[in-house]
Design a protein with these regions (language model features):
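N-terminal Rossmann-like dinucleotide-binding module
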Residues: 1-50, 141, 258
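A general structural signal for well-ordered alpha-helical segments in protein cores
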Residues: 13, 43, 79, 106, ...
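C-terminal helix-rich "cap/oligomerization" subdomain common to oxidoreductases
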Residues: 45-51, 61, 69-74, 250-286
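Beta-loop-alpha module in the N-terminal Rossmann-like domain of NAD(P)-dependent dehydrogenases
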Residues: 48-110
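A contiguous active-site-proximal alpha/beta segment in oxidoreductase catalytic domains
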Residues: 100-159
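Rossmann-like dinucleotide-binding domain that binds NAD(P)(H)
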Residues: 149-214, 261-264, 268
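C-terminal substrate-binding/catalytic lobe of Rossmann-fold NAD(P)-dependent oxidoreductases
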Residues: 191-244
Length: 286
């Protein structure tokens, strides 16, 4: 199985390269034929570690040469740009968070993938964290009264501002409570600070989302019988293997682990949050 990694700026590229290099008994049939990045330092980091030996001069250079593509660019705008040529060619793609940096690109990428039979997976790896599994089980088996999710955000960066890190909270939220958000109301007192509060209206209950500058991931759920369930996680590195294994299984089996809309839906919520705190009003989810 031959793959290429496009956009090797973030830690996911290192994690995937390390998994392949250090675990030949599990990934011996997988070869990284090359990488691409607009940042020379990122290319040097990956090649110096021996994860890849070839760096392409353009992101579409691996067309016709790979069985799958991994897109891990830091800027979400590049996810659409890097993945689209491969999607049009029907090549399976893993696309890191955010899936895309705007709703129209996300819809178009998913629609093109479906039309061309290109399998897709990706998004935030935090949907795999073990600590939220009991909460997801409670949300499915008991009546929910309310809940919270808290995750870090980075508002001041060159990789899309709010969009850069915000999908993690969304995917924890959706893993626990499902895709049934009716509306969002978001508050951002100061765009220069890492602080946003969001009310996710699920119809019969609300969940409060807290974006902060603390690199901890927490969630809580209160059921109708007033029992409270909590999750706390500060070690998420192991989830890189979960998402890479999901991609490998998808390519080998020819079966997507999710629907195309599952990849677009978090982008819709992120767009709604940004519009809500910018326009200072409740945004309904279509």
């Amino acid at each position: 199985m031959k793959i290429a990694i496009l956009g090797v700026e973030n830690s996911h590229a290192d994690a995937f390269g390390e998994l392949i290099k250090l675990n030949p008994e599990e990934y011996g049939d997988i070869e990284i034929v090359g990488i691409y990045s607009e940042e020379e330092d990122a290319v040097k980091r990956i090649t110096d570690k021996g994860y890849a030996t070839y760096a392409a001069s353009s992101p579409d250079e691996f067309l016709g040469k790979v069985d799958g593509v991994v897109v891990t660019a830091r800027h979400g705008d590049n996810h659409y740009k890097y993945a689209m040529p491969y999607v049009k060619a029907g090549v399976p793609c893993f696309i890191d968070k955010p899936f895309c940096a705007n709703v129209e690109n996300a819809k178009e990428l998913a629609r093109t993938a479906e039309e061309n039979g290109a399998l897709l997976c990706g998004g935030s790896c935090l949907k795999f964290i073990d600590e939220i599994k009991p909460l997801a089980r409670m949300a499915k088996t008991k009546k929910v009264k309310t809940g919270t999710v808290a995750c870090p955000v980075n508002m001041n960066n060159i990789y899309g501002g709010f969009w850069f890190y915000s999908q993690h909270l969304i995917e924890i939220l959706l893993t626990i409570y499902g895709k049934n958000v009716k509306s969002v109301t978001a508050f951002c007192p100061d765009n220069t600070k890492n602080r946003i509060t969001v009310i996710f209206n699920f119809g019969e209950f609300d969940v409060c989302g807290f974006y902060t500058d603390s690199y901890r991931y927490t969630a809580s759920l209160m059921t109708a019988d007033n029992n409270i369930y909590q999750a706390y996680c500060d070690d998420v590195v192991y989830t890189f293997k979960n998402e890479f294994d999901e991609f490998v299984q998808m390519v080998k089996s020819g079966v997507m682990p999710c629907d195309y809309d599952d990849l677009v839906y978090p982008v819709k919520l992120l767009d709604a949050i940004e519009r809500s705190y910018t326009q200072k009003k409740e945004i309904f989810i279509e």
